[in-house]
Amino acid sequence: YILTKAFAYKVNAAKFPHADGEIKVAIIGSGPAGLGCSDVLNQLGFKVTVFERDDRPGGLLMYGVPNIKLPKEILLAKIKGLEEAGVQFCLNTNVGIDISWSAIREQYAAVVICTGSSQPRPLKLPGNELAGIHYAKDFLTSTTKGLLDHQLTPGTFLSAEGKDVLIIGGGDTGADCAALALSHGAHSILQAELQDCNMARISQEGFCELVKGDVSLQYNTKVKRLLGDDKGNVSGAELCRVEWGHTDSGMPVAKEIEETTLVLPVQMVLLALGFSGPEPVVFEKFGVKKTPLGTIANVSGSFLAAEPGVFAAGDARRGGGMVAWAFDEGWDAALECAKYLTAK
């Protein structure tokens, strides 16, 4: 909400650089961390190029947040301001695939990795091979891209119209999916969260989205398996209630409650289980190491991620979180990068 208002009133409007510098910096990823980082480095006089694998800049903000939460004209205005200030965006370019990491390192004095945490956690239960099961990111992206391309016609996007939709995961991404499915005209929407309401990660804004719509948000609910029809499409889900306790070592554990199992009709399943970290190409191609949590390892107390001149910021470094945190990471990483380049 705060970022939307800030964009609308140009609080974060890009400023023109203090000097026309010749030192080139590459930023990989144009999500909130990448945008924040590019803004600061550009203001400090560095020549900034942002590499983005998608057809539009913005990353998570462009395709991972529905228009009903962040109108894209606001985001596009922010990006236009950055371009006018001198930031260059290189789109449809997947670093490590379309352009090699070695080429990036040769051409740029420093690199800031802002790829985000975009590797979705997989579904691990019987029936996960059925058609009609989609990651939340793919569902959100298909509608947003269709709207922006003016191609939102039947068959061109993942539509929930007339379907019984099961959303697995009770966080903000799940709430976004619920709101979007509601706008599609879904027949029913159930959002199932294994944790109780005190453990689940959903903001007040996300909760209000569900309350305003005809969405059933069920905590302490376990999806046991998904059922399919004779054509291999998902047709139902078996669920049960759970109660939380602790193991002898104190770890929380969910125990199924007897006689609470039920089967519901389902024609679409959306997986909002969070993300496990950056995608494999980041670790395979960029020379960075992975933490036990799946994020990019960095020098303690620093944004430095690998060899000198390589930094990481945002969800790629700290794990999934709020958009505001990613912007903040991008700003701070830019300052550290600038300090490194100035000293060099």
Spans of model-derived segments:
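FAD-binding core/adjacent interface of flavoenzyme oxidoreductases
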Residues: 1-28, 87-164, 270, 296-301
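Beta1-alpha1 glycine-rich phosphate/pyrophosphate-binding loop at the start
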Residues: 23, 27-95, 121, 126-128, ...
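A conserved short coil-to-beta-strand element within the FAD-binding core of flavoproteins
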Residues: 91-105, 220-233, 245
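A short helix->loop->beta-strand "cap" motif at the edges of active sites that frequently abuts
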Residues: 109, 186-187, 308
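Active-site proximal loops enriched in glycine and acidic residues that flank catalytic Cys/His/Asp
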Residues: 115, 137, 169-170, 193-196, ...
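FAD-site-proximal beta/loop scaffold in flavoenzymes
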Residues: 129-162, 247-320
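Long hydrophobic segments that form regular secondary structure
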Residues: 158-198, 253-268, 275, 294, ...
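A conserved FAD-binding loop/helix module that cradles the flavin
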Residues: 177, 313-343
